[in-house]
Amino acid sequence: MQPETQSSALPAYRFSIAPMLDWTDRHCRYFLRLLSRQTQLYTEMVTTGAIIHGKGDYLAYSEEEHPVALQLGGSDPAQLAHCAKLAEARGYDEINLNVGCPSDRVQNGMFGACLMGNAQLVADCVKAMRDVVSIPVTVKTRIGIDDQDSYAFLCDFIDTVSGQGECEMFIIHARKAWLSGLSPKENREIPPLDYPRVYQLKRDFPHLTMSINGGIKSLEEAKEHLRHMDGVMVGREAYQNPGILAAVDREIFGADTTDADPVAVVRAMYPYIERELSQGAYLGHITRHMLGLFQGIPGARQWRRYLSENAHKAGADVAVLEQALKLVADKR
């Protein structure tokens, strides 16, 4: 399945960062890669329509991001297959189909969590992609939708998509999704987590590779889940408190390495930032992903405030970051 990382015998899917709309863009992924060399990264969801009809380059990424997966949103097998071929040609390591996002704009486009109600269509989509690419095609989904939340429903979905779609890897968000009445944010918080159900799913489908997602806030929790699952996917915590990634290579992958130093990570971003600024990017679009880096460290609040107040100003460059670092370094 997933290609193994160069410096570890353990596969990259053992620990991954969730695809998060408006968050895990290419700037964010470049930054996260500096914290962990081995974590599997995912793009934001990109719709097939955007790739096929959009004017921008929705498949852009930096070579340094590997291993990196493209998450696709769509429900037309032919369009998904076309986009999967494009992504493989660009060098992506995996294609992931979004069958978990419950937002209204996703449902209106007939993709995301609403697809859970049509397992055969999901199977057709996965099979169409698998037929045209050699990289893994995976599915990220929930444990149920609306009142279709029995364990039997979940098993039927997995059985159909793995059997007829030939999907070999699933990422399971351990909550069900309400397709109406809750916002995407509420759907990440209100439906209760049911980790034991996901563990049971892995036991009942031992031949499939499965990662668990939802509410995981520490590496200790991740290691507990790994007693039952093949992989762990962390979402909001990794974005809001990215410092937890500094120890992932050592603690999760068993690498003989020192943990990433956050100050060194900031300075390692400078060449990338300077290159992006020279191509028309705005500093604030990059530094917004770095605000939580020093969480729990004296000076963290001053770091966030200084970047928030200065990164958007005309002509802002790496000098803003260097000045912000002084507010943290002086307290270390």
UniProtKB/Swiss-Prot annotation:
Supply the CDD domains for this chain. Answer: DUS_like_FMN
Q: Which reaction does it catalyse?
A: 5,6-dihydrouridine(20) in tRNA + NADP(+) = uridine(20) in tRNA + NADPH + H(+); 5,6-dihydrouridine(20) in tRNA + NAD(+) = uridine(20) in tRNA + NADH + H(+); 5,6-dihydrouridine(20a) in tRNA + NADP(+) = uridine(20a) in tRNA + NADPH + H(+); 5,6-dihydrouridine(20a) in tRNA + NAD(+) = uridine(20a) in tRNA + NADH + H(+)
Q: Gene3D superfamilies of this UniProt entry?
A: 1.20.120.1460, Aldolase class I
Q: Which family does it belong to?
A: Belongs to the Dus family. DusA subfamily.
The entry's function note states: Catalyzes the synthesis of 5,6-dihydrouridine (D), a modified base found in the D-loop of most tRNAs, via the reduction of the C5-C6 double bond in target uridines. Specifically modifies U20 and U20a in tRNAs.
Q: Which PANTHER family does the annotation name?
A: FMN-LINKED OXIDOREDUCTASES SUPERFAMILY PROTEIN
Identify this protein by name.
tRNA-dihydrouridine(20/20a) synthase
Residues of the site described as Interacts with tRNA: N98, K185, R188, R301, R304
Q: Gene name on record?
A: dusA
Matching PROSITE patterns, A to Z? UPF0034
Q: Which HAMAP family match?
A: DusA_subfam
Q: Where is the active site?
A: C101 (proton donor)
Specify the species: Salmonella typhimurium (strain LT2 / SGSC1412 / ATCC 700720)
Q: Which UniProt keywords apply?
A: Flavoprotein, FMN, NADP, Oxidoreductase, RNA-binding, tRNA processing, tRNA-binding
Q: What is its EC number?
A: 1.3.1.-, 1.3.1.91
Question: Could you tell me one molecular function GO term of this UniProt entry?
Answer: tRNA-dihydrouridine20a synthase activity
InterPro entries membership = Aldolase_TIM (IPR013785), DUS-like_FMN-bd (IPR035587), DUS_fam (IPR001269), DusA (IPR004653), tRNA_hU_synthase_CS (IPR018517)
Entry binding sites for FMN: P19, M20, L21, Q71, K140, H173, N213, G214, G215, G235, R236
On the tree of life, the source organism's domain of life is: Bacteria
Q: Cofactors per UniProt?
A: FMN
